[in-house]
Amino acid sequence: MAPSGPTGAQPSPAEPLSRSIFRKFLLMLCSLLTSLYVFYCLAERCPPGSGPVAGVPGRGVPAGPRELAMWPAGAPRKRLLQLRQRRRRGRSGPGDSSDQEEQSPGLAAAPGGSGAGSSVAEAQPGTLALLLDEGSKQLPQAIIIGVKKGGTRALLEFLRVHPDVRAVGAEPHFFDRSYHKGLAWYRDLMPRTLEGQITMEKTPSYFVTREAPARISAMSKDTKLIVVVRDPVTRAISDYTQTLSKRPDIPSFESLTFRNRSAGLIDTSWSAIQIGLYAKHLEPWLRHFPLGQMLFVSGERLVSDPAGELRRVQDFLGLKRIITDKHFYFNQTKGFPCLKKAEGSGKPHCLGKTKGRAHPTIAREVLRQLRDFYRPFNRKFYQMTGRDFGWDG
């Protein structure tokens, strides 16, 4: 019998045809893998700024419709950006604050957050940079402007689940405390966003800051404003409870509430009381923004029906309704809805340990007098916003 030929030669009549096909397939596969490996090695050696790359902003040729169509959808893009941010953070030294990941004060141990003073890390050189837009920092298109202890932190954390929302975790306090630093400084606080994503921030004190409406309007008259409001009586008690946890030696709630207890005069100079005068604080905002550019979210419904309120918010922001009932579960211990999966994490997360903190017991007569005091302000607020929040029922 004649000896067999070398590998890849024509099969002998006795050799099955399938074995020959399989052998050729293996050769082609090995060649393909070798070529891909060589291409990958060469790409990794190329410096990030070696030349214009189509479709990558800041690297030459701007992205066109063809490149945009090839980019991943919103959610995968957001996860990839967060992954690159965490990797870059691991390599950064302690003094490199520009690459530090923001830590939201509200969501305990929630990885992948985004907030003040941070930036998404630059794309690593190589093939990923050809497919991913690294994004850019933008001034916020939407701001949660109030109110303190109304549920602003919960709303922001819920919104950050949406793949098209990028938000600062910490409160920037730009329009009330740091306006002198300029818009460039403010923009640098923002996270990077991709095409189709919106930038957000929340600072509840803006709502009661006299200069804030004009300053935000000067930045952009198209800014969308969200106000989370809550029964002013329970809001005041919650405000006091937070202060009490930091300063246990402060006077009682009752003594701070009244300017003259025997006459029943409420002390409106106390910030816990003054913030609840929503109608008064809303007036300057309506001089700079149309009512249709503002959304008033019920803090009570954010607890009882978070998906319903988030549906309104998503519609207001022009976002696809992605956040639904399936994203929430009710924590019986805290008496508050929690996220089944927080941003950048596959694990359930509730807001921080202060959420659901027990309030001190307030005398019924004090509560009655406070409700009587707030009633005319509440009714005016209902008329101004076109929504009855039911605080006087």
UniProtKB/Swiss-Prot annotation:
It is an enzyme of class 2 (transferase). Signal peptide: none annotated. Residues 44-393 are lumenal. The chain crosses the membrane at residues 25-43. 3'-phosphoadenylyl sulfate binds at residues 149-153, 230, 238, 355-359. Disulfide bonds join 338-350. It is found in: Golgi apparatus membrane. Glycans are attached at residues 260, 331. Its EC number is 2.8.2.23. Residues 85-121 are annotated as: Disordered. It is a single-pass type II membrane protein. GO terms for biological process: branching involved in ureteric bud morphogenesis; glycosaminoglycan biosynthetic process; heparan sulfate proteoglycan biosynthetic process. Substrate binds at residues 171-177, 202-205, 270-271. Keywords: Disulfide bond, Glycoprotein, Golgi apparatus, Membrane, Signal-anchor, Transferase, Transmembrane, Transmembrane helix. One of its GO terms (cellular component) is Golgi membrane. Belongs to the sulfotransferase 1 family. PANTHER family: HEPARAN SULFATE GLUCOSAMINE 3-O-SULFOTRANSFERASE 3A1 (PTHR10605:SF64), HEPARAN SULFATE SULFOTRANSFERASE (PTHR10605). This is Heparan sulfate glucosamine 3-O-sulfotransferase 3A1. It comes from Mus musculus (Mouse).
